Every structure is written in C-alpha cells, then in structure tokens.
Amino acid sequence: MARQINDTFLRACRGEQTSYVPVWYMRQAGRSQPEYRALKEKYSLFEITHQPELCAYVTRLPVEQYGVDAAILYKDIMTPLPAIGVNVEIQGGIGPVIANPIRSLQDVERLGEIDPEHDVPYVFETIRLLVNEQLDVPLIGFAGAPFTLASYMIEGGPSKNYHKTKAFMYAEPKAWFALMDKLAEMTIRYVRAQIRAGASAVQIFDSWVGAVSADDYRTFIKPAMARIFAALREEGAPLIMFGVGASHLVHEWNDLPLDVIGLDWRLSIREARRQGIAKAIQGNLDPAVLLAPWDVIEERVKRILDEGMERPGYIFNLGHGIFPDVQPATLKRLTAFIHEYTSTN
C-alpha cells in the first residue's frame, strides 16, 4: 500500500484552493547537489538511471533537502528511444548524440514499438520503490514531447536552430507525420506505464518547440500532442505541458486536454491569464535569478507569487532547469520562504 502523501501539489494541478503555494524545481534532482556529483564520480548517468535504488535516491534527495512538494523521476527524456531502435549516446559536454539520424520515410518505418515494462523495466521498478516505500509527496513522471525527440533524431544531436528538423518537416511531410505518429504512440505507452506504476502526475517536456511558429505548431505538431493528452487523460493523473521559449504557443496548449501549463520567464503569469489561459499555471522564475543575492531573489519571487495567487491553481517553479552552480542552501531557503509567504493558516 502506498504511503499517505501531501497532496497540495495535486490539488493545485486540479485548480483547487490550497493552504499555500506548492513548489518543485525542474532539475531539482541532479547536478546542483554535491551528493549527486559524488555519485557521478562512481557511476555514469546510464548506470544511475538503470539501477532503481540509485535512481530512487537521487529522485528523493531534493524532497528531503529542500522540502519541495513533489518529486520528479530522475531519468532522461531519451530513455525510451533505444527501445524503438534509436542508437543514443549521452556524451559529456555535448548531450544526446544519435548515431543513426532520421533522413527518410524508410528510416521512420524501420522504427519499432516500445513495450515499456519489458524494454525499460528499471523505470517502473524505480517508481514502485519510491511510491510504495520512500515518498510522502507526489511523484511526477515525465517524457519528452515528439517534436523535441524528433529534433534530436533528425539533427543527430543538440542544435542551435533546428534547421534540419524544420527542413524535414517542410520537405517530407509524409515522413514527418509518420514520425510524429510513432513518437506519439511511444509516449502514450511509456507515460501510461509510469502512471500505472504509481506516478501521480506527468509533465511532458517540449524543450525545443519554441523554434517553430504557432502556425507550424498547429499543422505539424499539435495533432500528435492532442492524441497523447487525450489518451493519457483516461488515466486520471494531472497532465502538465512545458516548453522553452514557447510563449507564442500557450494558446495552442490551452485547448488541449491537459491540466497545467508551465510558463518560462518570457511570459508573466498575469499576462498569460489576461490572454485567456484558463488552466492551472506552473512557473516561472528565471533560473539565473537564483545566482543573485537573496534580496534580489526574494523581490523577484514575491512578484511571481503575487501574480500566481490571484487565482487558485498555481504551482511555483522555475522557467527552466536549475543551473549546476546554484547553491542547495538557496533552494532550501527559497522553498521555506515560498511556503511561509503564501501560507493562509
């Protein structure tokens, strides 16, 4: 039987009134923590993510250290890709590198299908270990969105302008939509299995979708996203959408069957709501602010919290991941400040 959890985060996801603003941080588990860096001296990322005990330790560490209101599963967005035939290597200082980039419809057709519990069993072993024994806050599962995954698969690795991805999208629409369908199906199966293993909510990361226009999003990407969220909606867990540099796309997300829209720092919460965003909102402190003196951090955070609390359904987060040189003590102090400043008790 799962342990009793603090459900403040989940209630905020559903747009309910909460006694304080819940908080978690993207990349809260990992590179900014000395315990994690010590672990990386002994184990590779591959080894950590493939060993449930190590992965669970990294996942729960920020909950214990910072007092955040949700844990997010420590995995990489590339985790499910090898199961469908994509050769991925995480190279230090570079990121994911794909040995066999997509160049044609034939390349897409060669991709297989994922059987999550068979192909990546360590993901679900980690989830079950956390929710059954270790966590007293909700666990967030996650996956990369089709566009971001496709960008790596087509570019062969990280890109500054995604020109190969967009050229493929424009020049090979049949192959593009076939790839979106393959990745949508993979995402549905992978995330559904996370929820059924015990994840209480899910965030879909579309890290690079800000590279496309709203018109292109509607044409080339949104159909796959609508399919993903409609399928996952049946599982009953809150669904969160987040993209970087995607302020021009939040209206497209607003009519998808999801619960929470994650904002980066480029669009204020108040402005998003003024423009008609009716879902719960998560965000949106610029992570660089965490490297400033405390008085600067406090002033910026108060401004965001004041906007967020104007309506129920608000979760504090950053507008992207924590930088490696942010001090853990800053995150602990920030979490306590948010809880105290927003408490209605």
UniProtKB/Swiss-Prot annotation:
Transmembrane segments: none annotated. Its EC number is 4.1.1.37. GO terms for biological process: protoporphyrinogen IX biosynthetic process. Substrate binds at residues 27-31, 46, 76, 152, 207, 320. This is Uroporphyrinogen decarboxylase. Pfam families: URO-D. Homodimer. The record marks 76 as: Transition state stabilizer. It comes from the Bacteria. It is an enzyme of class 4 (lyase). CDD domains: URO-D. It catalyses: uroporphyrinogen III + 4 H(+) = coproporphyrinogen III + 4 CO2. Catalyzes the decarboxylation of four acetate groups of uroporphyrinogen-III to yield coproporphyrinogen-III. NCBIfam families: hemE. Pathway: Porphyrin-containing compound metabolism; protoporphyrin-IX biosynthesis; coproporphyrinogen-III from 5-aminolevulinate: step 4/4. InterPro entries: UROD/MetE-like_sf, Uroporphyrinogen_deCO2ase_HemE, Uroporphyrinogen_deCOase. Belongs to the uroporphyrinogen decarboxylase family. It comes from Geobacillus kaustophilus (strain HTA426). It is found in: Cytoplasm.
